[in-house]
Amino acid sequence: MVLPKIFSYDIDERINLIQTITGKKPADIVISNVNLVLTPTGEILDNASIIISGKRIAGAGKYSELHRFIGKNTLVIDGENNYAMPGFIDPHIHIESSLLTPHGFAKLALRHGTTTVVADPHEIGNVLGSRGVEIFMDAARNLPLKILIDIPSCVPATDPKFGLETTANIIGADEVEKLAALEGTIGLGEVMDFVSVLNSNKSVLEKIRVAHRYRLIVNGHAPLLRGAELDAYIDAGIWSDHESTIYEEALEKARKGMYVFIREGSAWKDLKALLPLIKNHTIDHRFLSFASDDINVVDLMEKGHMDRIINIAIEYGVDPVKAIQLATIGPAMRIHLEDHVGVVGPARLADIVLSKNIEYIKPHTVIANGEIIYYKGELKKTFNNYKYPEETLNTVKLAKIPEPQEFIPKINTREGIVEANIIEVTPGSALTKHVIEELAVKNYNVLADPNRDIIYAAVIDRHKATGSMGKGFIKGLGFRAGAIAQTIAHDTHNLIVAGNNPEDMSRAVKRIVEIQGGIVVVDEGKIIGELPLRLAGLMSIEEPETVYEKYKKITNELNNGYGLEFESFFMTLALVALPVIPEIRLTDKGLVDVRKAKLIPLINK
């Protein structure tokens, strides 16, 4: 673990804090007349003031002689009886899923009061390897948003020995050790390959051993694991999880000492199901917090980030202060930085959010590291852009563009009915269902059935130009246009394409190659929407407002023109290719039974 310098102990900085609060030196900023949310105790202190010196808080509370902290250069902010709370912390996020670079994400996250995130860049790591992680870390430095890094633990997501997919890169124990020595690392990213953990796979355990040696936090990914299997997973030295989707599952994990992150992202929303964990139990702050995991640019722009999750919790009846604790001191204690963040109090970094109301959090003034980033909704800070190497902008390599007929599964029977293994998706859930449906066969082709919401799907290797392509069917997407193709296909991020019309599927794939990554929607041979994502085929290098407008244009077209009411459509499609979340997935090698970590046939004989 090599924390950024801002977390280091600076004697001169500490002297300034002491001299400021004892009245020997004027403060840089004084915020007066606020209702101070005390996250350690769950109280609200009215008519409080916050004294800031440099990057840190010299003191916070009631002061009878406030003038003794004020000099001629002190900025005095009247809090106007607003609520002051710590900057929000997201303990687990994949920034790439926002479709934004660290620079673009920081602008939006800070607007909504987030001042610290722990990012697991395994998306770019899968595409560009440890080199991609290093580039991401470099881009994340020198931003007012503190972006701490979890080193990807599962690149690829499954053991290559299983042969489940064509992967671009491998981040092994040696790469983990190299990355652990870089400034900004705090943890080992979610250990997704729980099958290998339960099988005592030494290559996975070696990464965990490296993490423990470097005192990195080890993060988990244990969907539906219970009983002895969960014990075995924890025995490996993995201490957190954000995959709980039912209350009993989350409670068991908490009882066994796991840190439970309650996930409320764009595609999967687990807060409502896990509410009893907050409302019916007195679980210690250290073992419970909110996390977003994956959040898209539309939600960031329109609904917010951690403030959005806090507000949803309040709407569900959670006490506002408790909800704030789960986005501040809770995650701070999990990442062992509670002496720096998560509290508005002496010695802590001056990460402060002001909101007029506590029943509905709407940040209007955000201070990060003692610097005013937003003041009454207006951006006061310039964000420097990062120049990405050319190698990161050209990552889509196909052997050829598949012909339309190649997207249709073939069998040796000319006509008839067959039973197919189909992936059924559910809005708002990361899980899929393995369902068996009867499909018609015509001229040796197994046909999709749009009337039952069963469409064609394929995943194509886009890293090594092998020509490898897996075919299948998806049920439940509600997609009525001709085709959609995207280079976001967790976690290997091969090219995934789905649709009702094989000709449109081929056209969409061709366009993806031309723009070198992104999202393309085609209907009746025409491109009706596209969003270029040049950076690793995952992120746009444009400003967040531009990305939002282009993304919104596609979603509006699908909603208004084709009746698509699936809020998390793009992310749900991307997850179809992730062979570590039950029950069944599709890769460039074919259908995967996740629990067995084996390929299965598309058609049952």
UniProtKB/Swiss-Prot annotation:
Primary enzyme class: hydrolase
Reaction it catalyzes: adenine + H2O + H(+) = hypoxanthine + NH4(+)
Alphabetical keyword list: Hydrolase, Manganese
Protein's name in the database: Adenine deaminase
InterPro entries, per the entry: Adenine_deam (IPR006679), Adenine_deam_C (IPR026912), Amidohydro-rel (IPR006680), Metal-dep_hydrolase_composite (IPR011059), Metal_Hydrolase (IPR032466)
Gene that specifies this protein: ade
Pfam family, one: Adenine_deam_C
Gene Ontology molecular function, alphabetical: adenine deaminase activity
